[in-house]
Each structure stands twice: as C-alpha cells, then as structure tokens.
Amino acid sequence: MKIIYIDLDGVIADFDKGKNNHPLGNITPYIGRPDKLPGIYENLDPIEESIESVVKLLNHSEFDVYFLSTAPWDNPDAWTHKRLWIVKHFDEKLIKKRLILCHHKQLLIGDYLVDDRRFNGASEFIGEWIHFGSEKFPKWKSVLNYLKVQ
C-alpha cells in the first residue's frame, strides 16, 4: 500500500479565496501574514473537485491517505480549525486520526506528497512531491490521472 500525504491549504482548502474575503485581511498586523488571521481556517471553501478526488483516494485499496499540513505557530486556534475543517467536509469514518500537523514534512516517510508549496520541507520530501497547481499538476484531475485513479 502506498502512503499519500495531502496538504490542506491551497490543495483541498481554498486559502487564497479565504484570506481575500476575511474581514480583517487588510489590517496591518495581518498584511503579509494571512495565516495569523483569527478564524482563517474555519470557513475556507473547498478547491474545485478536491473533496471528490480525496474521497476517491481514501476509498482506493492501493493508497493509505493522510492529511499533512502546517499550522502557524503563532495562531494556535488554527490547529483545531484545520481538524474541524476536514471533519466538516469528509465522512469522519474515512478520515478519523488521519490528520498530521507538522512543520518539517521532509521527516515523514511516504510515497507521495501532494502540496502546492515547496516550504516546510515539501520540496525535500523523500518520496515524490506532486506539486499541486504547477504546470504538470494544475488541478485534481491531473493528480488522479497520474496516480491512475478513476
């Protein structure tokens, strides 16, 4: 069974839309640090086709799927909100105890990491980094095709 880690922000949760719509987004302490916005992670919309695609992976017999995200150190509520977000959007039977919050993604052992950014160890991940949003993997359909999941 192959292990797949899937980032949350920018991969299945639309962080960019959320920060642009947040009522405090233009206030000085948060400019350039949208991850510190209070409640930023609570009500993010899912990225198009992300929920359906992740459910396909969760139900696929060849993959062991985990959510792997970094939560801002200075925004401890974000740690809880990320968990609540996945419970809101996925059947808890499929995702229970499958959330890993980590600032050093390169330390985890796995086959694939689906992540939109190279930070927090994503680009040094020992398995294969599937760079979501890149030319090769612009949308979830391209990720599923690459993993040979229908």
Where are these regions (language model features)?
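C-terminal cap/substrate-recognition subdomain and adjoining C-terminal extension
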Residues: N75-Q150
